[in-house]
Amino acid sequence: MKISPLNEKHVALNAKMADFGGWMMPIEYPGAGVLAEHAAVRERVGIFDVSHLGKASVKGPGALAFLNRCLTNDLTKISDGSAQYTLLCTPTGGVVDDLIAYRNGESDFFLVPNASNTTDVVAVLQSCAPDEITVTNLHMEYAVLAVQGPLAPKVLESLGINTDIDYMAFDHVTIAGADVILCRTGYTGELGYELLPLTKDAVAVWEALADAIKPLNGLVCGLGARDTLRTEMGYPLHGHELSLEISPVEASAGWAVGWKKDSFLGSDVLTAQKAGAAKRKSMALKSLDRG
């Protein structure tokens, strides 16, 4: 079982811990609980440790064209310093994983897949990569922290960080003396940011964030609230709304497919499904009342 570099912090807070994708991670914290943590993010701000998320790099001449042949979305549609939600499919249209691709340049990309699928994502890309492309698993090299909620900018601004970046854009900033990748992304449906410090700097950055949310009545939040927040927003989770048996078209995630690209892994099957061959399609339901 893997543990977060912040594991001792969670244990000290008496967090309820559980296996999440092969990682022992905090689900909720005493004195608050999932509902209170959920409300804090919707109304104020919350911070999350999501260091279980995967990290990988794809580098080399032609990395842009290579990834565009593998991933569903069109990376030519974003510029350097931007990120994109995308999927890696099998030749039969199933989803190996959904992930965020950070574009540093045409020959340099950073990927953030899901925890339990990182090894599979790296293996698929390595098996497809030409000699000049290097795909590296960096899962243990970085932590991932999230600051989510309408007051998220105030948290970072109190630490001297410029928060005026576009949605899905990223920058390199300094927090607690550490170099951090700051991206205007999240998994809650609220205004927010995700931060990637090196593992060795995770505790210092976390402590700075934890101190900064106190004047705003923010909360430290677990993965239980993250799941209810993403469900309320309608975001898919691999293994549930997306899987090797559920395609992007069937999961109503066709918006993350670059339909005008020449081809990519699974493109023939997905194109046929889009044209009407899909036998099923997930739909969201909104509860109007309790019950």
Question: What do the PLM-derived regions correspond to, one by one?
Answer:
Residues 42-43, 71, 88-90, 205-206, ...:
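Short, intrinsically disordered/low-complexity patches at protein termini
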Residues 79-95, 163-176:
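Conserved alpha/beta core surface patches that mediate binding of polyanionic ligands
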Residues 69, 77-79, 88-94, 99-105, ...:
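Short, charge-rich binding segments
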Residues 1-86, 94-96:
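Acidic, proline/glycine-enriched N-terminal capping motif
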Residues 1-29, 37, 102-291:
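Conserved, structured C-terminal
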